[in-house]
């Protein structure tokens, strides 16, 4: 990097920061935090515990956004000041220090850009993520288990928690079906871009002839619905089936039919839960999963109407990403149209940049 490149970088980042300021409106956030502080000092505020919890959640989100905003703004302001001083004093070491810190500033601005993009109502919610292997038996079921590990590692890297709601092991390897509750900051905002069909091309470890196989798995992501979102589901709208639950690989086979499968008749949406030995608790969790799925479907319908897309095109049936292991190694996302060569790292959960590239490309379009 030379002086010209660094000067242009600072100009570009300053412009981005100015745009971010216009969207974030930090002054309004500070005022909102001050208002909530006043409310919290009122004894009446705590009488309604559910409302108090919602207001405090709002305060936490405002404070989190302000913290990230200030980190980015201070970084760019400090960099400009330090660079001007280095040029005035013709300090080559200080100029080199500025150049070395460029990537850190870019990362902070990018983090803030993503924060701005994750501003929809449910982006801050926890996520319910389900993986379903396509046709292809053991090969597809193994691919589903690879995706499961990728998402669990991704959540782990971000400090999010993962709860298995439903798990059905494959006959020989892999999984037939799995649903997770992933809890963490902006979990749904990030994971919503994973909705769709994931395609794998590799030489199958299950083929003695070592032939290349193509496998598919669908990923469905819904926001965990808060109690303040009212979704009414009547008993006549659903069909409830019970079955015996089993853990991963068949452990802890339950002799009673505690596992629950709920089918929403009108939409055909199916959810199931077997993470608890109590049928009552599994039903409650399955109903929550169903509400989340229906809410996600309604959000997609609304977006489609605005964009003029036919409802028949909505859903989780579009291929979004290809993972090629042979004859070369590459992962390509169809939304961002970006290819990645760090296949092993991505399958080990390093999917942050890939997700963020999709968010940015969707915003531009």
Swiss-Prot record:
Methylated by PrmC. Methylation increases the termination efficiency of RF2. Its main location: cytoplasm. GO terms for cellular component: cytoplasm. InterPro entries: PCRF, Pep_chain_release_fac_I, Pep_chain_release_fac_I_sf, PrfB. Belongs to the prokaryotic/mitochondrial release factor family. PANTHER family: CLASS I PEPTIDE CHAIN RELEASE FACTOR (PTHR43116:SF3), PEPTIDE CHAIN RELEASE FACTOR 2 (PTHR43116). This is Peptide chain release factor 2. It comes from Sulfurimonas denitrificans (strain ATCC 33889 / DSM 1251).
């Amino acid at each position: 990097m030379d002086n010209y490149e660094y000067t242009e970088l600072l100009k570009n980042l300053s412009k981005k920061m100015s745009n971010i300021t216009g969207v974030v409106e930090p002054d309004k956030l500070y005022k909102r935090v001050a208002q909530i502080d006043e409310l919290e000092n009122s004894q009446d505020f705590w009488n309604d515990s559910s409302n108090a919890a919602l207001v405090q959640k709002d305060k936490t989100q405002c404070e989190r956004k302000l913290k990230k905003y200030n980190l980015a703004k201070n970084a760019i302001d400090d960099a400009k000041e330090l660079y001007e001083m280095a040029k005035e004093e013709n300090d080559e070491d200080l100029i080199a220090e500025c150049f070395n810190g460029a990537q850190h500033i870019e990362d902070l601005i990018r983090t803030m850009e993503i924060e701005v993009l994750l501003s929809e109502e449910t982006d801050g919610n926890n996520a319910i993520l389900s993986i379903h292997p396509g046709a292809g038996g053991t090969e597809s079921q193994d691919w589903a288990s690879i995706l499961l590990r990728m998402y669990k590692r991704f959540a782990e890297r971000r400090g999010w928690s993962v709860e298995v709601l439903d798990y059905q092991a494959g006959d020989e390897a892999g999984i037939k079906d799995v649903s997770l509750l992933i809890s963490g900051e902006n979990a749904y905002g990030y994971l919503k871009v994973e909705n769709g069909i994931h395609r794998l091309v590799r030489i199958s470890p299950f083929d003695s002839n070592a032939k290349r196989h193509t496998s598919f798995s669908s990923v469905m992501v819904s926001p965990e619905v808060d109690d303040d979102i009212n979704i009414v589901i009547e008993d006549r709208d659903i069909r409830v089936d019970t079955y015996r639950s089993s853990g991963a690989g068949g452990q802890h086979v339950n002799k009673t039919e505690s596992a629950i499968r709920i089918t929403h008749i009108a939409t055909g949406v199916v959810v199931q839960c077997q993470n608890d030995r109590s049928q009552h608790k599994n039903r409650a969790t399955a109903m929550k999963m169903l509400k989340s799925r229906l809410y996600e479907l309604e959000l997609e319908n609304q977006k489609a109407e605005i964009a003029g897309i036919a409802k028949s095109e909505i859903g989780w049936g579009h291929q979004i990403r290809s993972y090629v292991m042979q004859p070369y190694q590459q992962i390509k996302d169809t939304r961002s149209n970006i290819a990645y060569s760090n296949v092993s790292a991505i399958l080990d959960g390093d999917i942050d940049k890939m997700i963020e590239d999709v968010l940015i490309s969707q915003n531009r379009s």
